[in-house]
């Protein structure tokens, strides 16, 4: 029992430390309330093709031991808001609020990057899932491509990192599930270059690898936009 309590306390302390570090890093340059999702992360000077060439290529590791709680037991906090509401606040427009400080988004409009549809978000038991927060690099995909070797604080940062989070159409997100670029790309072809570049940026940041099929799929997309830059994050 003492050993279990010690492990539980260490995990909680680690989570608090990770949350504090994440909040400090993010709020040193607070993201505006209304930002077009296609440019939510400022571009670096690095071409996506060059960044892709530096990613390790390996096979997918077994999913053995995977549990989302090994990343974060629910959304972490970014300042006064949880990560879900932080992303809704960043990606939606014409927002109304349910509380103060302005954390819980009541209504808003999403220009969905995955489908190019305009979605009217209304918070509610039967309506909230119309807009979901997608991990651009899926959590289980990360687990099978390097995250098993990361510390809890690194996995926590990955799970709650705005670079890897995007408000999107709920059905499109469920269709994607835990797919990588080899098996799923946004139906909106106009967003595919940005999508792939962001996946590459996340994988580079957290030292995750790609499979050969995934690398090839990314390369095919980037042939249509050879000057695409990876986002900063």
Model-derived segments and their meaning:
Residues 27, 38-81, 85, 212-214, ...:
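N-terminal module-boundary/linker segments of secreted carbohydrate-active enzymes
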């Amino acid at each position: 029992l003492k050993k279990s309590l010690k492990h539980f306390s260490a995990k909680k302390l680690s989570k608090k430390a990770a949350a504090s570090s994440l909040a400090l890093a993010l709020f040193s340059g607070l993201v505006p309330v209304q930002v077009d999702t296609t440019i939510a992360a400022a571009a670096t000077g690095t071409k996506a093709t060059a960044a892709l060439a530096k990613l390790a290529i390996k096979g997918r590791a077994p999913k053995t031991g995977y549990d989302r709680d090994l990343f974060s037991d629910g959304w972490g906090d970014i300042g006064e808001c949880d990560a879900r509401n932080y992303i809704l606040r960043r990606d939606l427009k014409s927002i109304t609020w349910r509380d103060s400080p302005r954390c819980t988004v009541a209504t808003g409009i999403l220009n969905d990057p995955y489908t190019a549809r305009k979605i009217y978000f209304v918070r509610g038991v039967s309506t909230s899932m119309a807009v979901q927060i997608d991990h651009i690099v899926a959590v289980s995909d990360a687990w099978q491509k390097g995250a098993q070797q990361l510390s809890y604080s690194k996995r926590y940062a990955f799970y709650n990192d705005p670079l890897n989070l995007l408000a999107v159409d709920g059905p499109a997100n469920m269709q994607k599930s835990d797919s990588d670029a080899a098996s799923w790309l946004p139906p909106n072809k106009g967003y595919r270059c940005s999508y792939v570049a962001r996946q590459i940026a996340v994988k580079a940041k957290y030292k995750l690898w790609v499979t050969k099929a995934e690398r090839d799929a990314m390369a095919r997309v980037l042939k249509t936009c050879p000057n695409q830059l990876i986002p900063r994050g």
